Amino acid sequence: MRDYDEVIAFLGDWGPFQRLIFFLLSASIIPNGFNGMSVVFLAGTPEHRCLVPHTVNLSSAWRNHSIPLETKDGRQVPQSCRRYRLATIANFSALGLEPGLDVDLEQLEQESCLDGWEYSKDVFLSTIVTEWNLVCEDDWKTPLTTSLFFVGVLCGSFVSGQLSDRFGRKKVLFATMAVQTGFSFVQIFSTNWEMFTVLFAIVGMGQISNYVVAFILGTEILSKSVRILFSTLGVCTFFAIGYMVLPLFAYFIRDWRMLLLALTLPGLFCVPLWWFIPESPRWLISQRRFEEAEQIIQKAAKMNGIMAPAVIFDPLELQELNSLKQQKVFILDLFKTRNIATITVMSVMLWMLTSVGYFALSLNVPNLHGDVYLNCFLSGLIEVPAYFTAWLLLRTLPRRYIIAGVLFWGGGVLLLVQVVPEDYNFVSIGLVMLGKFGVTSAFSMLYVFTAELYPTLVRNMAVGITSMASRVGSIIAPYFVYLGAYNRLLPYILMGSLTVLIGIITLFFPESFGVTLPENLEQMQKVRGFRCGKKSTVSMDREENPKVLITAF
């Protein structure tokens, strides 16, 4: 009995049909790149200080000294959330007293920004922060905005697979594109922060659903050899292209509503893709819609210039194939033995902390020295060589060492940021980008590594659980950025330390390179450096002489 890949092998691997599907599905990911990171500019916090109304009768000297100073990054700057009590300094101004000469400013009573704030417009003309004053006592709302977007991403990752299984890959792909584009457009008309945030969470649901379904559709249509290229370089590289486009839009459009409109419009260009992207033949077969699946393959063969067999799918053969029942599995199977539980816990930590590093570095771009638009572009650009490097390393080297190696690289250079003199800002930016390179490379390898560690029976569940852990990491990441308001170096110290720590933990994983994928839980390799309880002589013999074939990658 042949499987699906054997049935359609006559199509070849890289004909016009496969190239069309590869590039169209990859291109559909571009809006995900700029929508996913748009919060960097939509919720940017410009320099600000308390507003001193023009109606207050102050001399020019007292107006210039109405804001207390504080030391920040080694220089004196006006405080962002405090001012001298206006009634007091107005009296001093009326008496003709001079600040700093007749009055000791350090002894003056201070008050909060009772009349609002004035914001610098050097970088942003308007953001949701300036529109709804998400600063000082309300500055906690800014990271929460981003976290709730990723909560939407987490929810979307739950439902996207189930929806595509029920209604089909193609319909759900375009429906979730519509959700992402439509609700992004509705966000433009937000009247308050609460409305914006709820809509942003829905956009997050649409964004990840679009990504996941495009990923599934590509892996089901493309052949095995192209499937790896699509999942590692295709979708990831086009996501990075969208990421790089974002700062170009933001540079020329500095009003958040107009920027959001500009980022929404490209989603309309995905509409014509409906007539070029087919439904997944695999899904159609699973729904017993054999004729529709055969029509798609016939069109693909015609596009590739290949003569297709008269009958491609034998209903009896496929019915027999679909009738095979898999053993039911439960989440507790990932913790069935001490060894499996250890691998699962370490995998969850690896995914979550790597995700924290990736998203914290991406979202922390506004806090870097220099031009925020250039830094954001570089942050997206550095991902392209990171993905290519990961792809090349996965082809030739053991998984544990390459993942640990790039994590050590990323964490190490992030820890070096704290020793760079303040005058060498370009060095700090370079180190941060090198750190992003390492973390991004590691992140892109995790799907392959996790899939190779677990047996077929629980592989999808394991990847799903660890992927959920990465969503939790993305929810936490904005608060690492938030710590930068207290100390500019603190996020890098924490991210660098955690990245090095998870790199060390990676060395305790079993190696999966060149090893046949396990088919059941008993074939899973043992964690290195851990004792998994007492073993019988028989079980010890099995571990010393495992029945696992070593194959070339």
Swiss-Prot record:
Keywords on record: ATP-binding, Cell membrane, Glycoprotein, Ion transport, Membrane, Mitochondrion, Nucleotide-binding, Sodium, Sodium transport, Symport, Transmembrane, Transmembrane helix, Transport
Subcellular location: Apical cell membrane; Basal cell membrane; Mitochondrion membrane
Record membrane topology: Multi-pass membrane protein
Spans through the membrane: 21-41, 143-163, 172-192, 198-218, 233-253, 258-278, 340-360, 374-394, 401-421, 429-449, 463-483, 489-509
InterPro entries, alphabetized: MFS_dom, MFS_sugar_transport-like, MFS_trans_sf, Orgcat_transp/SVOP, S22A4/5, Sugar_transporter_CS
Major location (coarse): membrane
Regulation: Allosterically activated by intracellular ATP.
Alphabetical list of PROSITE patterns matching this protein: MFS (PS50850), SUGAR_TRANSPORT_1 (PS00216)
Gene3D superfamilies on file: MFS general substrate transporter like domains
Extracellular topology ranges: 42-142, 193-197, 254-257, 361-373, 422-428, 484-488
Biophysicochemical property: pH dependence: Optimum pH is 8.5 for ergothioneine uptake and transport efficiency decreased at more acidic pHs.
GO annotation terms (biological process): acetylcholine uptake; amino acid import across plasma membrane; carnitine metabolic process; carnitine transport; lactation; liver regeneration; quaternary ammonium group transport; response to exogenous dsRNA
Annotated catalysed reactions: ergothioneine(out) + Na(+)(out) = ergothioneine(in) + Na(+)(in); acetylcholine(in) = acetylcholine(out); glycine betaine(out) + Na(+)(out) = glycine betaine(in) + Na(+)(in)
Record topology, Cytoplasmic segments: 1-20, 164-171, 219-232, 279-339, 395-400, 450-462, 510-553
Tissue expression profile of the protein: Expressed in intestine, liver and kidney. Weakly expressed in brain, thymus, lung, spleen, heart and skin. In brain, it is expressed in cerebellum, especially in the granular layer, in hippocampus and cortex. In kidney, it is expressed in cortex and medulla with relatively more abundance in the cortical-medullary junction. In heart, it is expressed in myocardium and valves. Expressed labyrinthine zone of the placenta. Expressed in Sertoli cells in testis.
Residues that carry a glycan: 57, 64, 91
Binding site for ATP: 218-225
GO cellular component: apical plasma membrane; basal plasma membrane; mitochondrial membrane; mitochondrion; neuronal cell body
Pfam assignment, any one: Sugar_tr
Misc: Mediates the Na(+)-independent and pH-dependent bidirectional transport of xenobiotic tetraethylammonium (TEA).
Family the entry assigns: Belongs to the major facilitator (TC 2.A.1) superfamily. Organic cation transporter (TC 2.A.1.19) family.
Assembly and oligomerization: Interacts with PDZK1.
Stated role: Transporter that mediates the transport of endogenous and microbial zwitterions and organic cations. Functions as a Na(+)-dependent and pH-dependent high affinity microbial symporter of potent food-derived antioxidant ergothioeine. Transports one sodium ion with one ergothioeine molecule. Involved in the absorption of ergothioneine from the luminal/apical side of the small intestine and renal tubular cells, and into non-parenchymal liver cells, thereby contributing to maintain steady-state ergothioneine level in the body.
Protein's name according to its UniProt entry: Solute carrier family 22 member 4
